[in-house]
Amino acid sequence: MKWLGESKNMVVNGRRHGGKLSNDHQQNQSKLQHSGKDNVKAGRNAGERRSSRCNGNSGFEGQSRYVPSSGMSAKELCENDDLATSLVLDPYLGFQTHKMNTSAFPPRSSRHFSKSDSFSHNNPVRFRPIKGRQEELKEVIERFKKDEHLEKAFKCLTSGEWARHYFLNKNKMQEKLFKEHVFIYLRMFATDSGFEILPCNRYSSEQNGAKIVATKEWKRNDKIELLVGCIAELSEIEENMLLRHGENDFSVMYSTRKNCAQLWLGPAAFINHDCRPNCKFVSTGRDTACVKALRDIEPGEEISCYYGDGFFGENNEFCECYTCERRGTGAFKSRVGLPAPAPVINSKYGLRETDKRLNRLKKLGDSSKNSDSQSVSSNTDADTTQGRNDASK
């Protein structure tokens, strides 16, 4: 995955959909983690060096005016993201989206620190969904889509007894960080965001997934500045405390440039992978990012990024993206006992995968599905009518 202007020096750990990592990939990742952990401390103390590198000639883009540096620890990012999505996205979509703190504490077998270590103040807080307010919260989001009043929406979202208890143990800075994180999610519904979040049940590993879809035309090299990702570095201890394999490790990557694992959450974490992506991630600060269009994007087209060569198994053999389905590769590649794809008569010439042609084919496929469903419905109605007429006779 080319992450924030880096070349192929990033190992992605986790899953977004169909995330079946190969053994070789896991072993390589483990080697990278052990080889890089000695340099984590030095990397953290080099804040000025990292900051200047972001503004230099390393391939990073300029900072966005929308997203200040979050400054959240991994634990804070997990807690803030869980609560923000439960207040904003879950009521709107009608189901619970992915959460980081899915249980009170990782199983004992997954912990690798000694009994003498004291981390009680850093233990992750188990996520508890806000119940009984879903319709009320959804109305708040619908009102925000009309008036776009951030402060008013935040006040309505955080009203109630639960909020008083929640903020009781938070200092002013923690309250500010949480508020800014909620604002990031609210801005997804702004008129000028240029995208929307919709349910997505395409992928086998997700029952209640989501996708990001463009609502306006984006030109090549445009930045989708409100489609924000938030990053927090993970120490080895934090990895053991916060992550559970196959459960909440959907947005974790390992940076060989910074020699540490990084947690990646926020609205951009809902971007799905495609082997022919139309966007890429670009930096907007030390620990934030947005996406940049690689080609023209039409309204209604899903926004996608490339996760990496081995994210869905060896050579992405388990990938379920649209491109793999169209090409007959990844999870759609013919297996033993299944019919092989029709051979190409003349492989010297072929139609290039242009955006317009692919969009036209997709629209034709969608219209064909709709006509088929309408045909089935009309036939069913006709059969029912005929049956009634026969019965009346």
UniProtKB/Swiss-Prot annotation:
Zn(2+) binds at C275, C319, C321, C324. SMART domains: SET. It is an enzyme of class 2 (transferase). GO terms for biological process: DNA repair; methylation; muscle organ development; positive regulation of double-strand break repair via nonhomologous end joining; positive regulation of isotype switching. Its main location: nucleus. GO terms for molecular function: chromatin binding; histone H4K20 methyltransferase activity; histone H4K20 monomethyltransferase activity; histone H4K20me methyltransferase activity; histone methyltransferase activity; metal ion binding; S-adenosyl-L-methionine binding. Its EC number is 2.1.1.362, 2.1.1.361. It is found in: Nucleus; Chromosome. Residues 35-51 have a biased composition (Basic and acidic residues). Keywords: Chromatin regulator, Chromosome, Metal-binding, Methyltransferase, Myogenesis, Nucleus, Repressor, S-adenosyl-L-methionine, Transcription, Transcription regulation, Transferase, Zinc. S-adenosyl-L-methionine binds at H98, Y203, S204, S205, E206, A210, R257, N272, H273, E320. Residues 24-33, 53-66, 379-393 have a biased composition (Polar residues). Residues 13-66, 103-126, 360-393 are annotated as: Disordered. Histone methyltransferase that specifically methylates monomethylated 'Lys-20' (H4K20me1) and dimethylated 'Lys-20' (H4K20me2) of histone H4 to produce respectively dimethylated 'Lys-20' (H4K20me2) and trimethylated 'Lys-20' (H4K20me3) and thus regulates transcription and maintenance of genome integrity. In vitro also methylates unmodified 'Lys-20' (H4K20me0) of histone H4 and nucleosomes. H4 'Lys-20' trimethylation represents a specific tag for epigenetic transcriptional repression. Belongs to the class V-like SAM-binding methyltransferase superfamily. Histone-lysine methyltransferase family. Suvar4-20 subfamily. Homodimer. Interacts with HP1 proteins CBX1, CBX3 and CBX5. Interacts with RB1 family proteins RB1, RBL1 and RBL2. Interacts (via C-terminus) with FRG1. PANTHER family: HISTONE-LYSINE N-METHYLTRANSFERASE KMT5B, SUPPRESSOR OF VARIEGATION 4-20-RELATED. This is Histone-lysine N-methyltransferase KMT5B. The gene is KMT5B.
